[in-house]
Amino acid sequence: MSFERIQFFLETNPEYGWMLVFLFGFLESMVITGSFMPSAILFSLCIYLYNIELLSLPWICSIALLGSHTGDVCGFLVGKSIGPSLLKTKFIKKRQKAINKTQKFLDRFGPYTVLFGRFIPAVRPLVPFLLGITDLRLKRFYVADVIACSAWALALALLVVSVAVSYTH
């Protein structure tokens, strides 16, 4: 899907702008779709919506936060549900040493991993899934993820405004 198509869709259906922000925030955070979906799509969409004044910056960032947080929680729950059976596969058992190392790291730094992982696009969708496989409780993950997504939304706001200002000058 090209950005031009999204732009055309929004020009003819502006009432769906907020849904697209939520959808792309969600999709880039999910373990499967987020692995191949570039963050630039959501970023470009947010800049576009801000520039044409379809949504205010607080709305854009709040909706993106909700979408990304929802995607993270879903990824965590997927990890909780299929993680134990995934760890029993031959593929994973052959890499048990690396898995144990990763598990120890995540057990020790789990909530901090959520925060740092949120700012690294390549690992963003994997962190919630991997933490779901560990013994981290949902409540602890949830709190860490709300903090991480809030910090990310603030960074998104700063980037949107800085890029949008450069387009107007």
Q: How does the language model describe each region?
A:
Residues 39, 145-146:
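Central hydrophobic cores of alpha-helical transmembrane segments
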